[in-house]
Each structure stands twice: as C-alpha cells, then as structure tokens.
Amino acid sequence: TAWTFLKAMQKCSKKREARGSREAPETNFPDTTEESAQQICCTRDSSDSKSVPRSERNKKGIQCQGEGSSRGSQPGQFVGVTYNLEKRPTTIVLINDTPLNVLLDTGADTSVLTTAHYNRLKYRGRKYQGTGIIGVGGNVETFSTPVTIKKKGRHIKTRMLVADIPVTILGRDILQDLGAKLVLAQLSKEIKFRKIELKEGTMGPKIPQWPLTKEKLEGAKEIVQRLLSEGKISEASDNNPYNSPIFVIKKRSGKWRLLQDLRELNKTVQVGTEISRGLPHPGGLIKCKHMTVLDIGDAYFTIPLDPEFRPYTAFTIPSINHQEPDKRYVWNCLPQGFVLSPYIYQKTLQEILQPFRERYPEVQLYQYMDDLFVGSNGSKKQHKELIIELRAILLEEGFETPDDKLQEVPPYSWLGYQLCPENWKVQKMQLDMVKNPTLNDVQKLMGNITWMSSGVPGLTVKHIAATTKGCLELNQKVIWTEEAQKELEENNEKIKNAQGLQYYNPEEEMLCEVEITKNYEATYVIKQSQGILWAGKKIMKANKGWSTVKNLMLLLQHVATESITRVGKCPTFKVPFTKEQVMWEMQKGWYYSWLPEIVYTHQVVHDDWRMKLVEEPTSGITIYTDGGKQNGEGIAAYVTSNGRTKQKRLGPVTHQVAERMAIQMALEDTRDKQVNIVTDSYYCWKNITEGLGLEGPQSPWWPIIQNIREKEIVYFAWVPGHKGICGNQLADEAAKIKEEIMLAYQGTQIKEKRDEDAGFDLCVPYDIMIPVSDTKIIPTDVKIQVPPNSFGWVTGKSSMAKQGLLINGGIIDEGYTGEIQVICTNIGKSNIKLIEGQKFAQLIILQHHSNSRQPWDENKISQRGDKGFGSTGVFWVENIQEAQDEHENWHTSPKILARNYKIPLTVAKQITQECPHCTKQGSGPAGCVMRSPNHWQADCTHLDNKIILTFVESNSGYIHATLLSKENALCTSLAILEWARLFSPKSLHTDNGTNFVAEPVVNLLKFLKIAHTTGIPYHPESQGIVERANRTLKEKIQSHRDNTQTLEAALQLALITCNKGRESMGGQTPWEVFITNQAQVIHEKLLLQQAQSSKKFCFYKIPGEHDWKGPTRVLWKGDGAVVVNDEGKGIIAVPLTRTKLLIKPN
C-alpha cells in the first residue's frame, strides 16, 4: 500500500491553519454530483471530517479530480485516475516552476517538501521557523518556505514544510486547494448479481447514437470519465454489436445529467412479477414515540449487473466531425431506465434488511425504493442505536445513507406525506389552474386532488372532471366552467383548514362512515377513537346504469380491500341506506360473495322506489305501452286491459324517448296502486328494472320514479314487438292513429304553404331550360305517405300557367311511396327557364271513398314499390321466417338481413335483439387508424386455453384466423405463410409481442416483401381494428359453440358469419368489399399492362440536330427517356424533353 501515514503535528499559527483549511470554490470542482456517484471531499478541519481506515481505503481506492480529463495511471496524470493502492499514488506538479514527482497523501494534514527537492527548486523563498513532525523514525526538524504550485491550470500560493524525508508529500491542505476529492467507488463486491435473461427469439438493441451538440458532448464526456474511474462502467469489447443511444440534459442546478434510452432493451428482457404493488400509507402506521426517515444514496449504482448481460447495455460517445473513433462503454451496475433495476434493487435491499427485521420485530421498518422509515417505542438512546446499526448494515453492503437526507426531528417528509409523532398530513399543496387550461392541465389537477383526498376528507372532482368531456388531445383547450372554479375554491378551503390525521391503533376496532355528496360522489372516512386514520372518495357510476345500492356495495368491497391491505383488518361500515335495500339488492342474485358488518343509518337514498318493483304480475290493471317515431315526429300511446286507449304526439324526439313517455303516461293516468306495465322496449324495461343509477330531479326518468313511489307494487314486463301478443298489437296500432291523421313526407324540395292555403309547393331541383313545345320530366327528392281514404294530386300554379308551363303531374294513391316526378310541357311562345328552388307545382291531398284501404302500417312495403307509377312490389311479412332462420344459423347483422330479405330495418333489429348472443354486443374502441387496401393488422387472442392468431384487413374488415399450438416464432411463421398464400398483403401492423418481433418472423416478412410495423406509430389506438375483430370473433364463436363439437369448427363458422353475415363499408359485407378491392387492383394492373404494351409513336429530335424526325415507333418508354430506332444511328435513347408522343398515325 501507499505510504500515507505521516502524522503532522500542527503547531503553526491560526492564520496558517485557516489558510490551509479553507474550502476550494464550488465552481472549481468537476461535476461529480450526479446521482451516479457519492463523493467524500477532504478538508483540513479534522472535526468535520471522518477518518477512513486503511482497510477501507484499500477496498475503495482513491481518485483525485480537477480540471480536464485523461486516462491511464502514469505519474504525469492527476485528474480522473483511479488508484487501487497496489503502488504509491504519485503525480508530477510544478513547485516554483520545477517539475517534481510527489506522493498524494490524504492522510497527511500538512504537505512536506523533501530537502533534495527544495534544493532543486529554480528559485527559493525565505526560510521561516517550522514545526517538528513525528514520523516513523522519530521527531524530524523542519522549516517552512513560501511556494507556488501549479497543476492543470490551477495556481496556488502557500507555505510548505521542508524536512529530510524520503518523498515529497502533498497533504490535504494543498490537495484541497487543487480541487482534488476522495471518491469511494460504490460498486459493492459483497452483493451477488442476479441473473437476467432475454426473451426467447429476441436480440439486443442495435440503435445508432444520434449526434450531440458540442456542449452536451463535453458534459457527457466528463460524466463518463467519472463513471469510468469509479468502476461503474467499462469499455465495451470490440465485438459488441449492441447499442442504445444516450442523451444529456441540464438540470436546474446547471449541471449535466446523462440518460440512456433503454426502451428497446426493456422490450426484449424477461420480466418477472412486480414485487412492489403500491405505496405504504401513513394511516396504516402504528403510533410510535420515535421516528427516523432515511434516504439511500445512489442505490442503483451500488448493485452489480449480471456480467453476461452487460454487453446489451452498451452506449457510444461520439466526437465532433468524426475527429476520432467513437468510444463505447457498458454498464457494470444497474442503469437508470432499465426495466429490471427497480426489481433487482428492492429485492436486494429486502434480503439485506431481513436479518434486521427478524432481530427487531417490534420495530416498524418500511422500505419503498430508496426511502426507509423506522419507528420504535423504546428510549431515545435505543432508537438512535437502532439507526446507527441499520446504517452500518447498509454501509457494509455498499449502501450509503447521506447525513444531509437523514431526518431525525419532526416533521418528517415521507412519500409525499408529512409525519409528526402525534399525527400525519398530506404535504401542503395549493391547487391552482392556469388561465386557459388544456386537457393535460386538468388531468394533473385531478391527479393532485385524488392524491390529497386520502389526507383531506371531502375533496371532490365532479365538476372539474366534467370539463374534460369530449377532449381527446392532451394539448386541447378545455372550457373551464364556473362550477369547476367554485369546486376548486372549495377544495382549496378544505385543504387550508385540514387537520392532522391519526395513526392506527391495533387494539381498537375501525369504523368506516360513508356519505353521498350533492354531486353524487361517495366519500368515506376510516375512524378510531383518536380520530380519522384516512379518507377517500369514489365517483358513483350513474352513467353505467348502476343503482345507488349497487354502487355503494361495490364501494364497501373497495374500502374493505384497501383496509385489509393497509392494516390487515376490515372495518365496520356505517352506510346511508337501509337493511331492506341491501337485502333487496342481495335477492336479485347479484355478485356479492361476501358482506361486511354494516351499521345502517336512517338516511334513505334516492332509489328506495326499487322496493316497489316485484318479480311476479300483480292483480291490478295491465297496461300495454308503445312508442314510435317517423318523419321526425314521435308518438306515445297505451292500451289498458279494460279497453282504454290514449295517444300523444311528442314532436321531434327519438324512438326511445317515445317509449319512455308512453310508460310515463300510463303511470300518471292510472290511479290503481297495483299496476302491470307491458312494453316492447327492451331499453326501457332494462333501465327501469336494473339499469337506473343515481337519478335526481333533473333526470328524464324522474317522473317515472316518482310515479312508482306513489304505487304499492309495480310489475314490469317486456315482450318482443312482433310476437302476435294481442295487447301489444293494440298498443302498436294506437301509436299509429295520431300519426296517420296528417300527411307524412320526406325531402327538401317540398314547402309548406300559409295556413289559409291548401296543399304544398314543389320546388325545382336545379336550373332547367324548357324549349317551346318540349316536354320534360322533372324529378324531385320528395316522398309522401298519403293518409287513408285519401289521394295526392300534383297540379300547376297560376304563376307558371301565365308563362305557358303546363303541369301534368297526375294522381298519387296511398299505396305509392316513391319519389314524385312532375311532367312539364312548354305550350308558350318562348323558352321557359326554371331556377333552382323556384316553386313550379303544387301537391294537394284530397279524400275519397271509392277504395277500401287498410290502416297505415309502417312495417309494410308499398305494392307499387319506389320505381314510379305502374310498378309493383311484394309484401315482406312472408320473409320474416327466412330471416329468423338465417340469423339463428349465422347471426347475421340487422342491415344484411334487411337488405337480403327486403324487410324493414326495425324488424331486422328486433330479430337480432331476440338472439341471446347478439344482444351482448357493444361498440368497440374508437380512434383514427391507418386504413388502406391490403394493409392488415394481426394479434393473438386466447379462448378456452387455445391461441387464435387473427388477421384483419384494415380497409374492409375481412378477418382471417387460425389456431396456433404455441405462441412462438415457428408457429407464427407458419401461420403467416398460410395467410400470405391466400391473400396479397402489402403491409402488416402488430403489437410488440415476442412472437411478432422474433428474428425469424421479422426475416420472413422481409423475404415476403411485407412491410412490418409494431407498437403505436400512427395512433395510441392503432391496434383498435384487430382488437375489435378479436372481440367480435369471440362473440360469434360462442354463438356457434352449441352447434359444434370443436373450437376449430366454431371458429370457421364464426369467420363465415363475420365476413359474409355482417355489414361493412357502404352496407356491403367485408367479403364483398374485399373482393371488390381485389378486383379493382387486378383491373388497374391489366389497364397498366395494356397501356404499357400498346404501340406508341413519337416525333423526336436528336441532340445537336434542328429537324424533327418521325413519326416512328417507340420501342420502350421510361420515366425520363424513350428508345427509338433511328434510320441513321440505329437504336438510340432520346430524352422525353425532345420527344412528342402521339397515337398511331393513319
């Protein structure tokens, strides 16, 4: 080891002592304060410094840092050198402009110059009285002399002792002024590395390094030099092909920080189970007398990385203008940003702390990442000894706990909370909102409120959350409402007045009090006798159609799980509803497998009306309700069992609103206390019996709820709309009586007249010129439904008759539903010009009694059809059975049924709603994705423990799927070959699954010339097409499982249903769209070949000649030139700029 122990006896003056112990300026130190290293600065003040035993110095090594950087360990170097103390740490410095080889001795308080070196100085100063120093050979006489020391651009003037000793020593006084520091390398040799493996079929990242600016490059080199000297990185081997790019950012302190983009490496690593599933909560801490919070410094850089895995972490330091070859390094310790660094660190620290936990089971020791909490109930001295022992255990393994982050007095900052011996709080935070907030700003605000709600009871976010509706982009501006601002101010007031919360007492029971706010948010507090332990909130899912009791029962399960997680015990619940309501919810056979202990209050929530609903018919009156909508007008009606009928015109409402209003009318008009309501609206029946949630007076369902409250019992039943039920048919007819009183029409070219005028005006669809004696048929987009016992008459207008325009429109009977065409003849003496929008004819409705017509039925197609006068149609009723059979076999969609069997869409939808499998369908995820012919998406899904690989063409929605025996590269490659054989794909988009990014699959797609993309390059929902296809395919498979013996057979039947039994673009099936696209591609190729193969001729001019030649046949045409056979020069190429192409001459 180095000779470093000359004990200097300080007898010099206080002035010299002060001069020798002064701290070097902070700006003169190299930037070694990054998170990647822990450094110990040497000072002369022995009271503030800690001695480092020789044994530890032998392990850790010494590093001196100043300005500049270099590599190696020759005596001429000084900065960025690591000494392992196998030989003396020496360097060359200029003393009085004389180069001298000196020993660096951090154990010496004072620097000493040898007599020989003193005699070699180019110039020497005066001699002053020195002090005696005690060395190995006894007391040594000295004198002092002023010197000037230069090293790496640093100049210092001081005094040195001169003595007859073997070697010149630079002690701590001069080393400190030169900017040297003692750095203890923290890569622990005591900790065993953990094995890291790559996923099967993957390889390490090979991403090139992007350029860095000169300023960032200098910062990176400085950091890398320090990491290299500390042993945290090493030079990469010459045969290492891997690389992940680095970038450098400047911190607020102005110092650089080096980061590495390890995202591609993280994708290839085999990741285990997460062992840290959440943050510890102060409400679960047991109250203790003494607390201490510690922070572990540079935790990742203490743990060694698996040597076999280190090559995959390689990175590159480039140079400006390629001045020198790039320098490449690999990590020896856990790098920041690596997916397994948190797991390995926490697991390693857990094993280190386990003996301490077993030795002191009564001590609360919480470990989360690099934050430690220690709580005990012993004496203050005993607690301090525990902390010393714990820090020693960590230090022995290489983990340091810096003094500046050691919290021994309250309040303690821990994981965003403020701890005191008697209570705890959320760290104070003022909730603010910018003037024009974006979606990102509001989301951050909501996150802060949610975080603080556990420590500040009563915080709400309903109105703030409402401002984000309809916003998709993070930078999209939101409309900040007055309600949201008021809610924010109320939350700030609650935060300002918040009191400290208590710690858990294991000797007492806990009580959870649940309340519902005016904003329909459920808030709760967990209490003991000493006060509130923690609080929380949950927005009730009213929009999900869940009842209040169902919401609160879910909340109880959530709170019970949260409480068991934090303290290992479930509280007793005090809830704002009655026991009867809970029992009613339980009787519905819902999902509750466990019910906590509940204390019921007298408060009754809004959905007490549900107690009036029964499962069996009552002895009271039965009312059949129905609602409909056509031509923008809604009709609500009902028929009672005693023959009473009522209809009501609702105006422009939806069909569902009409159904709901019919039920409301029936309940309002019935005075009976026991009522049976029968509806054909599955939507209304499902909502009333199960779906309605927290409904207030502003809800459209509130009148129905209020009327149910006034009854004793109410029975609701649902029947399909076309099952031949007498009462339902009567209600259906009643809903049409009001509708048929007036003319029903569609179109934009029909205008209503004044109240005192008869009929309607018809308008010209576009500008038309009618010559003299010419007859034209003018089409319109007007369709009408003539009332019963009436007919329509198209005739002219007096204003047009003056100009000589004769209208021969004709009679429209009540069976015709096609578009109206008007026959016009110019009998005048000049041409007549009709302008778009001009009123040129009129339609008058007249009654007649010559024909006996049946009442209007919206579910009937005209006998004439829609092709004009004289055409005939067919009734669709006889096709219902065939459509039902079709749907039972193939689960065809409503639009395809309506198109194939010529039945109304409403009837087709009713057939679909009756199917128990198809009623479960919902809408898939929405979003903009890349769609084009022959662009496919692929994904693997699982059903019945089997793997299904799904391909879906993004343009048509055509699905191809196959079963895989294993989800690996080989099986995926075989499936891709089969897919490529059947189709002609140009591109494929998948996720980052191991089977899709495996090297064999990537190479196969390259060989097939299929462009392959992964991840989310186009949109965060770029997998939306195939995910939606997977869900649809699974639903169709389940629909066919009853009729098949194997999953393979059900899969093939489901593919037929998905591709040929549901609508896609423009009402066509995916199969029809796909075939049409392929035919179009083939047609375009044939046209291109035909165009290229056709004979072309041209005139041409040879460069250097003035006369045009030709015409002659073009032998070949390229993008920039043509090839012709010139009479004089033979076959030559002529630029297109000197040619004139033409068709074959006669």
Curated annotation (Swiss-Prot):
UniProt-recorded Gene Ontology molecular function terms: aspartic-type endopeptidase activity; DNA binding; dUTP diphosphatase activity; exoribonuclease H activity; magnesium ion binding; RNA stem-loop binding; RNA-directed DNA polymerase activity; RNA-DNA hybrid ribonuclease activity
Modification after translation, per record: Specific enzymatic cleavages in vivo yield mature proteins.
Keywords linked to the UniProt accession: Aspartyl protease, Cleavage on pair of basic residues, DNA integration, DNA recombination, DNA-binding, Endonuclease, Hydrolase, Metal-binding, Multifunctional enzyme, Nuclease, Nucleotidyltransferase, Protease, RNA-directed DNA polymerase, Transferase, Viral genome integration, Virus entry into host cell, Zinc, Zinc-finger
Residue ranges of domain Peptidase A2 in the record: 100-174
Binding site for Zn(2+): 887, 891, 915, 918
Region (Disordered) location: 13-77
Biased composition regions of type Polar residues, renumbered to the chain: 29-41, 66-76
UniProt cross-references to SUPFAM superfamilies, sorted A to Z: Acid proteases, DNA-binding domain of retroviral integrase, DNA/RNA polymerases, dUTPase-like, N-terminal Zn binding domain of HIV integrase, Ribonuclease H-like
Zinc finger (Integrase-type): 878-919
Alphabetized InterPro entries for the sequence: Aspartic_peptidase_AS, DNA/RNA_pol_sf, dUTPase-like, dUTPase-like_sf, dUTPase_trimeric, Integrase-like_N, Integrase_C_dom_sf_retrovir, Integrase_C_retrovir
EC number: 3.4.23.-, 2.7.7.49, 3.1.26.13, 3.1.13.2
Positions of the catalytic residues: 105
Catalysis: reaction(s): Endohydrolysis of RNA in RNA/DNA hybrids. Three different cleavage modes: 1. sequence-specific internal cleavage of RNA. Human immunodeficiency virus type 1 and Moloney murine leukemia virus enzymes prefer to cleave the RNA strand one nucleotide away from the RNA-DNA junction. 2. RNA 5'-end directed cleavage 13-19 nucleotides from the RNA end. 3. DNA 3'-end directed cleavage 15-20 nucleotides away from the primer terminus; 3'-end directed exonucleolytic cleavage of viral RNA-DNA hybrid; DNA(n) + a 2'-deoxyribonucleoside 5'-triphosphate = DNA(n+1) + diphosphate
Extent of Basic and acidic residues compositional bias: 45-59
Domain Reverse transcriptase per the UniProt entry, residue ranges: 230-419
Gene Ontology terms describing biological process: DNA integration; DNA recombination; dUMP biosynthetic process; dUTP catabolic process; establishment of integrated proviral latency; proteolysis; symbiont entry into host cell; viral genome integration into host DNA
Domain Integrase catalytic residues, every copy: 921-1078
Keyword Acetylation: no
Pfam families associated with the record: dUTPase, IN_DBD_C, Integrase_Zn, RNase_H, rve, RVP, RVT_1, RVT_connect
UniProt DNA-binding residue ranges: 1096-1144
Domain RNase H type-1: 617-740
Family that this chain belongs to: Belongs to the retroviral Pol polyprotein family.
Protein purpose: During replicative cycle of retroviruses, the reverse-transcribed viral DNA is integrated into the host chromosome by the viral integrase enzyme. RNase H activity is associated with the reverse transcriptase.
Name of the protein in its database record: Pol polyprotein
Source lineage: Viruses, Riboviria, Pararnavirae, Artverviricota, Revtraviricetes
Gene: pol
